[in-house]
Amino acid sequence: MGETVIEKIIRNNVGKTVKPGDIVTVNVDRVMIHDIFIPFVAEKFEEMGFTKLWDPDKAVLIYDHLVPASQLDDTRHFHAGDAFARKYGMKNVHRSDVICHQLMTEAGYVKPGNIVFGTDSHTTTYGCVGAFSSGIGYTEMASILGTGTMWIKVPETIKVVIEGELPENVMSKDIILRLIGDLGADGATYRALEFTGSTVKNMTVASRMTMANMAIEAGAKCALFTPDEKTAEYCDIELNEFQKSLTGDEDATYMKTITYRAEDFAPVMACPSQVDKIKNVSELEGTEIDQVFIGSCTNGRLEDLRAAAEVLKGKKVADYVKLIVTPASRKIYRQAIAEGIMDTLAEAGAMITHPGCGLCCGRAGGILTDGERVVATNNRNFLGRMGTSKVEIYLASPKTAAACAIAGKIVNPEK
C-alpha cells in the first residue's frame, strides 16, 4: 500500500512502516524555542532533573516576540534565555534579527524530511520545505531537550490539489484563507495537510511558507509540500533520494481530497474575529479602516514586500491611515533596501520597523484602541490580539493590504 508524505517521513525516522493512529517515538532533528517560552522551558528542564542537553547544536533559541523590550517583564525572558544558553552550551542563539519561523528555514536549520518541534503553534511553517514540523508546549520541549525524542500519533492526511494559473491579484494568502474557510477552524484537527498540483508546483518557497504557516488555523498537525528544485535552491542543498521521494503515492490512503481550480480564487479576507470567517474582498468594499500592517511570519518576506511596493509605487497612504511594515528578518530588510523597496514604501508614507513579530502579537508599536479597524497580513485576528477587545482585525494578502492603505478603506486590489 502506498504512503502519504507524513507517513514516509515518520517511517524513515523510526525505521518501520506506520499508519494513521499509530503512536511512535521519533528522534527529533531540531527544536526551536522563542523568547516567550524560554523561562518556562528552562524551569521545567531542571525540574525534570536533566543536567545536560541531548544535543546543544540541535536546539535554536530565538528572541522575536519581545524585542526590543516594551514591558518591564520582557527583559526577564532575555536574561533567562541567555543564562540557559550559557549553562548548557547552546550556540544557536539569535537575539534581535529575525522572526523564529523565518529563521529556521532561512538559516538552514530545517531540511526536507526532518522532524522539528517548536514552542509556537505556527511551527507548521517548515512544511514548506517538506519537513514534518509542529508546535508543542514547554513541558514537551523540556523533555525533548533532555532526551532528543518525542512521542507522536501518526496523523491522517487531507490532500489538497490546486491546478491552474492564479489570477493576477491573488496570492497564496488568499488560497490558504479560502481553504481555512472551507474546512473551518477545526476541520483539519490533528491531520496533515498535503498540498499538490500544478499551482503549488509553480509557487515560490516563500508562497508555500505562507500556506504552511496558516495550516494550524484549521487545526492541522502539520502541512507538507513536496521538495523540488526550488526547495533545493532555497535550502542550498542537493536533494537525496529520500527527499526526492517525499510525494504522496497514487495508492496512498487519504482521509479526503479537496480539489480547487486556481482560476476560481479571488482576493479574500478573514473577518473579525475568526480566521475561518472568510469573505471575498468585493463583499467588504467601502469599510473604512484606521491602520494597515504588512509583516509577520506569514507575509513579511521579500516577495510580500515587493508585492506591496508594486501597489504603493507612486501613491500615498490615505490621510488618517497608518501603514506599518515589518520585515520578517534582517536579511530580508537589507535585500529590500538594496532593491529600493524600502524607498518606495517610505515615499508612500509607511512606517518601517525593525525585523520581528511586531504588531502581530500586540507587543510592539502600533496597537489599536476601541472601535478601530486594521487590515493585516498576519495569521490571527482573535479578540484583543492587536490592542483592545473592541479592535476589528481583517486578515488579507500583502497586495490587498497595500491597496487598502491607499484607499483608506477596504478595496479590491484589482481597482
Please place each PLM-identified region on the residue numbering:
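Fe-S-dependent hydro-lyases/dehydratases of central metabolism
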Residues: 1-415
